[in-house]
């Protein structure tokens, strides 16, 4: 498939689930049924063994997204057969190699594997902890010498899976002519199989080889063997990650069902918030792994020849999936209590499988470190001169097919624009700027037509894809562009586009784009923060007007705003969610007063706004009267999507690298290990953000799963901020700009700002409650 056919992939997933459910795979695994050759042929008959093999080599050519869907279902069902070990690794390697001479032996072997007639493993590893082929040559390596028209192998291979019930192994060997790949039939004289079991009962072995003689047609390849093996192993890691995601999803589902049916202390176990939040945190790891896998497969499909990027992606995904699978299944045992520790309880079976897969082909720690070594360092904050020539305004098109433009060109254009037009005095400011400080920049973007990157073109936006939006955000952060007052752009605009009337869109959208109208949000009230539906600010109908009386608080930069979109209570006789309306208010109206709130950082970023019988035209109600709650939830979705943007984490990482480079911390293994973990967290945040940004761009409702994005983004930002304070040493407590790199490091700002973000848009604790109830389905949540 050239393009990813998601509908076809879901059909493949459904078909795989149906096939697996015809047998009780859990019982088959308990009975060690992995050596059932007839069932292996059934697996081959549905196309799984040749699914990712190119059609030109006799496979289905359906690609890795389809294979991942199958492996996820295999993990959920607990298929005992070694689909990765005897399917993915062998077929991928054989499809990738350049045959040595006649391609016939390779083609016949590949065909036999795809038809299920041969079960073949891959023997590549020479020592514990090895992540790439040939990495430990000389420790337990296999050597080959040519003798009398045959090949003689000597040496050892370790941790070979499958290690039993196989017809043979693909094996790497080193000789005078370099590395080579051979097919080693099982039972070859001189080969001793030291068998052992994995945690889940999967058969594995070490191979001891002493003067094993192979015929000439056993030589499969010479050129590029190590690279081909590395590629096969990386795809194996991606597919075992899909299997780990399936394991984690199933144990979470089993745990939810168990908690919903069991009671203690006179209450359902599912009603205990401590258990709810533990399940939500486990689910977060699972969704991060799933999104990371999807992101990696998309990136690899777009640039299949980039070996370094593939390796980094495989390690990133394996590190997250191993953590997700082990943590979720470990939690499932805890939540099931004593029964979870027994063999008869299915969650223990999943736990053992997660332990096996999590360690095989490299564990989470090893892959986190590999990812840290392979992933490109964040670009340092842009200097005034980055080697690019300044450009005239004519070189900055107001409109173009931005999504078709090569990303490097798009980013370079943004950098030139920022350098040409953004005020140098406002770069890298660690607090929110007021309208009088930033309005000229807002007007510049407005004139350029770049003020609304995410809006559709028909409403004056750039219609950027999520990938281009992220590029826009990253380049703005890199240059130090401050965030302008954007409540109208980020929140109200999308609401009016979806829910407003034509008259309302015509009246209000142009003012948002031009900067003529500056909007503030009016949601929170005293005693109605996360419990937003408890709001008391009321609007009483009086003819063609509504009379508003009450108070709003925590309204960002409302002292600078000209207008406010707000929630008001318009009916007190119904349940609290049903009597709320969404209203647009001119803050110049008589009866409006404002009082700034000084935050712990010393800045007046928020306001209290008071309404004393403020008259508002009834035409300013968005949607139906008393039907504002659904709009409110949609707007909160946009707000949480914005809170979940990776830009804050990206900026904090840049500052960490600025200090780390100057202090020599990148040579400290303890520091780089911690940094690699946080970089992985940030990368997976970006992957999760893309999923929800795609939904928003398509105009689809943002689901309650969005709560996970808000939690992960803000808590990742907080962790990064804490590391920044730590490595800044004494300056970690200084409220000043530091002289690292280009002098644009503010050690305190990311941490302090992240603390606020974990509270706004619904506290992270409330987000966990939402997810527990609306997504996991925990009763009593």
Q: Regions from the language model: what does each represent?
A:
Residues 1-78, 82, 100-105, 112, ...:
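Alpha-helical interface subdomain recognition
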Residues 47, 71-74, 184-188, 211-213, ...:
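Short Ser/Thr-interspersed hydrophobic loop/turn segments at strand-loop and sheet-helix junctions
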Residues 62, 133-138, 162-166, 464-466, ...:
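Short glycine/proline-enriched turns and hinge-like loops at secondary-structure junctions
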Residues 81-89, 163-167, 484-493, 516-518, ...:
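FAD-binding core of FAD-dependent oxidoreductases
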Residues 116-128, 171, 515-523, 567:
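A short, Trp-centered hydrophobic/proline-enriched beta-strand micro-motif
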Residues 123, 150, 154-192, 545, ...:
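A short core secondary-structure module
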Residues 134-135, 139, 159-160, 185-221, ...:
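Flexible, small-/acidic-enriched active-site or ligand-binding loops
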Residues 530-531, 546:
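Hydrophobic, small-residue-rich alpha-helical packing segments that form membrane-like cores
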